[in-house]
């Protein structure tokens, strides 16, 4: 199932240049804003807006994919904590934000959405180096 009005289904979000990996039921992309290094978005391939729209087996597999990828991010970025976000208010399509929180985190007790900052956009070379 696909929704042509959905930016995730139509391929306009996330940026395909930020593709990291096909995880099975989902795909991982480096988030556009790297103020929090390693911020990744794991996007469910099929259109669904709520976890309860998924079959139980899909929910289990999706959580396994998110968990495995979060573990890899935590190890790669030496995260002291991982943050997980599943909101869907701006992009109504199931996608998880995986945000490594590092030892030099500018606001370790705050949700990332509450930290005022200028977005950090990486060059194409830096994107490729990060996702390699």
Can you annotate each of these PLM segments?
Residues 1-132:
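HIT superfamily nucleotide-processing domains
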């Amino acid at each position: 199932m696909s929704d042509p009005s959905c930016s995730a289904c139509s391929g306009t979000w996330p940026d395909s240049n930020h593709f990291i990996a096909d995880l099975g039921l989902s795909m991982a992309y480096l988030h556009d804003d790297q103020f929090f290094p390693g911020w990744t978005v794991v996007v469910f391939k099929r259109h669904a807006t709520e976890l309860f729209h998924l079959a139980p087996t899909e929910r289990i597999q999706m959580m396994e994919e998110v968990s495995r990828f979060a573990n890899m991010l935590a190890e790669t970025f030496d995260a002291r904590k991982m943050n997980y976000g599943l909101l869907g208010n701006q992009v109504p399509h199931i996608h998880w934000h995986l945000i490594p929180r590092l030892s030099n985190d500018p606001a370790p007790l705050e949700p990332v959405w509450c930290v005022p900052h200028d977005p950090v956009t990486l060059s194409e070379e830096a994107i490729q180096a990060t996702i390699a």
